[in-house]
């Protein structure tokens, strides 16, 4: 399904990513990381959500990055294994680590055979700088995905405020950064409350690879995004008679303007008594 990227095949796979980007203008991303050191109440303000996310991302190491490049009839996926996380020494959420292990991540192998985070992002930054033209970045509930990507590309802690974070994301990634979870809320029969797998099930899409592996999750995110764009554009075209490309532009603008922070690390509001999972 995906090209697994390790220390021993890094250069060949990075060259493949560089070549593929010449033909694709869309990238779906997913991250696997050691969970959250601080959990955020569901009713927290945007600034508190951002403060907690910054603390979590600044103090933990990314374990996997999934990249799916797609467009012009091409779809190709890479799963980059990153070696900085040390289970015995690095800060982590024990429940999240157990969850990753139960879903098949071999943390010992990733530690021994993976790529250093700084080494990977130095070359990935160069590859992105070679890309000319607008890029579309696609996430699913993607605040942490964007945050780890930003941390890797800048090789710095996250900005101090959510406003600075949004500005830096736009500066580095451009204006067109989509969140498929939000898009699902615009579609008949779906909801922004649904997880990625449930949305795929409703759309009758079969997963390729294992859930909660960054490569498989990014690939499924890319396919769901493509389907939702197609359905949204065509449904609006039928109802308004406007050209499909005009409708897609409006959707892009709407996605860009939706700045509400979506977090993957939170605790339930006590009065509701409901449990939420990552």
From Swiss-Prot:
This protein's major location comes to nucleus
Q: Under which EC number(s) is this enzyme classified?
A: 3.1.13.4
Pfam families, A to Z: CAF1 (PF04857)
Q: Which UniProt keywords apply?
A: Cytoplasm, Exonuclease, Hydrolase, Metal-binding, Nuclease, Nucleus, RNA-binding, Transcription, Transcription regulation
Enzymatic reactions: Exonucleolytic cleavage of poly(A) to 5'-AMP
Which SUPFAM superfamilies does the entry mention?
Ribonuclease H-like
One GO cellular-component annotation of the UniProt record comes to: cytoplasm
Q: Which family does it belong to?
A: Belongs to the CAF1 family.
> What is the name of this protein?
Probable CCR4-associated factor 1 homolog 5
Q: What is the lineage of its organism?
A: Eukaryota, Viridiplantae, Streptophyta, Embryophyta, Tracheophyta
């Amino acid at each position: 399904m995906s090209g697994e990227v390790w220390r021993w095949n890094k250069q060949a796979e990075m060259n493949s990513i560089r070549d593929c980007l010449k033909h694709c203008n869309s990238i779906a991303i997913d991250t696997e990381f050691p969970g959250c050191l601080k959990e955020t109440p569901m009713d927290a303000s945007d600034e508190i959500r951002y403060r907690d996310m910054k603390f979590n991302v600044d103090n933990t190491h990314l374990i996997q990055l999934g990249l799916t490049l797609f467009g012009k009839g091409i779809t190709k996926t890479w799963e980059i294994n990153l070696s900085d996380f040390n289970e015995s020494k690095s800060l982590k959420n024990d429940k999240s680590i157990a969850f990753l292990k139960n879903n098949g991540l071999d943390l010992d192998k990733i530690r021994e055979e993976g790529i250093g985070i700084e080494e990977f992002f130095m070359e990935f930054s160069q590859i992105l700088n070679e890309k000319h033209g607008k890029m579309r970045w696609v996430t699913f509930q993607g605040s942490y995905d964007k945050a780890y990507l930003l941390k890797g590309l800048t090789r710095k802690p996250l900005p101090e405020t959510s406003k600075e974070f949004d500005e830096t994301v736009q500066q580095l990634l451009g204006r067109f950064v989509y969140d498929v979870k939000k898009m699902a809320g615009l579609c008949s029969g779906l909801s922004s409350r649904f997880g990625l797998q449930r949305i795929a099930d409703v759309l009758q899409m079969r997963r390729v690879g294992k859930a909660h592996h960054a490569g498989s999750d990014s690939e499924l995110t890319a396919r769901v995004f493509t389907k939702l764009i197609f359905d949204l554009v065509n449904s609006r075209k039928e109802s308004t008679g406007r050209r499909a490309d005009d409708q897609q532009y409006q959707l892009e603008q709407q996605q860009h303007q939706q700045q509400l922070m979506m977090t993957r690390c939170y605790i339930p509001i006590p009065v509701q008594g409901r449990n939420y999972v990552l």
